[in-house]
Amino acid sequence: MSNRFAVILAAGQGTRMKSKLYKVLHSVCGKPMVQHVVDQVSALGFDEIVTIIGHGADAVKSQLGERVSYALQEEQLGTGHAVLQAESALGGRRGVTIVLCGDTPLLTAETIDHVMSYHEEEQAKATVLTAELADPTGYGRIVRNDKGLVERIVEHKDATSEEKQITEVNTGTYCFDNEALFQALKEVGNNNAQGEYYLPDVIQILQTKGEKVAAYKTAHVEETLGVNDRVALAQAEQVMKRRINEAWMRKGVTFIDPEQTYVSPDATIGQDTVIYPGTMVLGQTTIGEGCVLGPHTELKDSKIGNKTAVKQSVVHNSEVGERVSIGPFSHIRPASMIHDDVRIGNFVEVKKSTIGKESKASHLSYIGDAEVGERVNFSCGSITVNYDGKNKFLTKIEDDAFIGCNSNLIAPVTIGKGALIAAGSTITEDVPSDALSIARARQTNKEHYVTKKNN
């Protein structure tokens, strides 16, 4: 197999998006479009990936990092000019180069590999990825010769009435012999209305030289969708969402309503998990087996253990053990660790805390910056008071402690093993193990007070 290279075009301004955000950084299923393209290419182990950047160059580099190399197109003078900027990285190297658009997030590694393999088998100098469209209006048509090779690509506006009947179109993805590509690019002119250098002109140059130009027609038309506006962005979102959800359903995950469930392409879900509508599984979240998620639940960059239920709640950047019950209306904030068999109930917020096995906070509690042992009970209205307006402090609660209703634990403070905090207490000092701590005003009953007051 030849050396393989990729050039990803990501320098266009994307004015039709009507956005301050650079076009290829708009997200599809939670990930920037250009990131999807890079991920698919990277999966094939290419020798080098060059991303052409221009508008928003720093933002694109920040997103992609060192996974790719970069070439700057300072002036946007067309797709041919853009690819030519990669010459410093790829010029003179033998191999095959595929040119991809950074706004085609649906293109898969499988299709990319098929195009390149077909190109090598055909021993062509160029291969065009094509698709058959029911309505090809606006697309360049593929005109083939009697041998089935590409004779020319005719833009819609230049096509004859007969050529407009052709339904095979150019998708904008090309595979080239690398050396032939850069040699031909230097011959591309800009004698057109826009004064730009167009990559498809390379096809005509190679044909004029008698070189072989092939076409690989994909059956997966939806993969070729280029996103140029918000309508196409929504279409891409729907296609990818369906693709992701169907893949998990085939692996044994139940989606009650796939159209209303959103799963990141980087997420992992275990067998026999059931996901209800309105649930979002975002980022690099890992879900165990036999879980119940939703409805209306958001999980992001978190790990959820087997047989855990998260209902109408939010979990971000945290780890949750097995057989845990969360919700409804709970919020697990970043850097939290919830161990096995814990109950986090309605209207409970946990932030940057560790909660030991079999502990419970069933309702209306805030647990922040805390180390909680095993079998601890937080009664209704329990609060760890962790912030003095400037600094955050630690609350430590040891195994088997019982925190009574409407209690405030003023950090830094330690509640000893098996200690009991009486309801309504405000605790400012450490409580020894097995102690009962009462920190509230003594109740006084004044008999007949109301009668005397009203007379």
Curated annotation (Swiss-Prot):
Positions annotated to bind acetyl-CoA: N386, Y387, A423, R440
The UniProt record lists the keyword Transferase: yes
Annotated keywords: Acyltransferase, Cell shape, Cell wall biogenesis/degradation, Cytoplasm, Magnesium, Metal-binding, Multifunctional enzyme, Nucleotidyltransferase, Peptidoglycan synthesis, Repeat, Transferase
Sequence intervals crossing the membrane: none
EC number: 2.7.7.23, 2.3.1.157
Alphabetized GO MF terms: glucosamine-1-phosphate N-acetyltransferase activity; magnesium ion binding; UDP-N-acetylglucosamine diphosphorylase activity
Region (Pyrophosphorylase) residue spans: 1-230
Top-level taxon: Bacteria
Active site: H363
Cited SUPFAM superfamilies: Nucleotide-diphospho-sugar transferases, Trimeric LpxA-like enzymes
Annotated UDP-N-acetyl-alpha-D-glucosamine binding sites: 9-12, 23, 73, 78-79, 140, 155, 170, 228, 333, 351, 366, 377
Biological or metabolic pathway of the protein: Nucleotide-sugar biosynthesis; UDP-N-acetyl-alpha-D-glucosamine biosynthesis; N-acetyl-alpha-D-glucosamine 1-phosphate from alpha-D-glucosamine 6-phosphate (route II): step 2/2; Nucleotide-sugar biosynthesis; UDP-N-acetyl-alpha-D-glucosamine biosynthesis; UDP-N-acetyl-alpha-D-glucosamine from N-acetyl-alpha-D-glucosamine 1-phosphate: step 1/1; Bacterial outer membrane biogenesis; LPS lipid A biosynthesis
Membership in a protein family: In the N-terminal section; belongs to the N-acetylglucosamine-1-phosphate uridyltransferase family. In the C-terminal section; belongs to the transferase hexapeptide repeat family.
Description of how the protein assembles with itself and partners: Homotrimer.
HAMAP family: GlmU
Protein name: Bifunctional protein GlmU
Lineage: Bacteria, Bacillati, Bacillota, Bacilli, Bacillales
Record gene name: glmU
